[in-house]
Curated annotation (Swiss-Prot):
It comes from the Bacteria. One of its GO terms (molecular function) is 2 iron, 2 sulfur cluster binding. It comes from Buchnera aphidicola subsp. Acyrthosiphon pisum (strain APS) (Acyrthosiphon pisum symbiotic bacterium). SUPFAM superfamilies: HesB-like domain. This is Uncharacterized protein BU122. The lineage of its organism: Bacteria, Pseudomonadati, Pseudomonadota, Gammaproteobacteria, Enterobacterales. NCBIfam families: iron-sulfur cluster assembly accessory protein. PROSITE patterns: HESB.
Amino acid sequence: MNKNEVKTYLLKKNTFQNISITKDAIEQILFLINLNSDNIGIRLSIKKSGCAGFRYSMKLLKASELKKEKDEKEVSFFYQNILIYIYSKDIPFLEGIRIDFVKNNINKIFKFYNTKLEKFCGCGESFSIN
């Protein structure tokens, strides 16, 4: 396998409710991926952080960061020409999310929306898990 090839597999039907990404977010993600030829996609995850306990994370994924062999603890799929990697343990918290790229005062930021989560901190940046 050369360094630009990526091993992927499709999720079984009815095991993952697709995420949705707005047009503005897709355009920005593709723009960021194309800034560096080693970028191949994004990794979505949750991290311990914030006053409520967890926050969503999205980072650019480089070909050089991928393991040679497929990791059974993660899934990968394409969404509108964006290669997305998710750790299996994070899937329950990422199912059904909507990612947008919005103007926040003078900045533009990625915003994650999940109607399944019930507890958020006051600023909306973190959430808790029951």
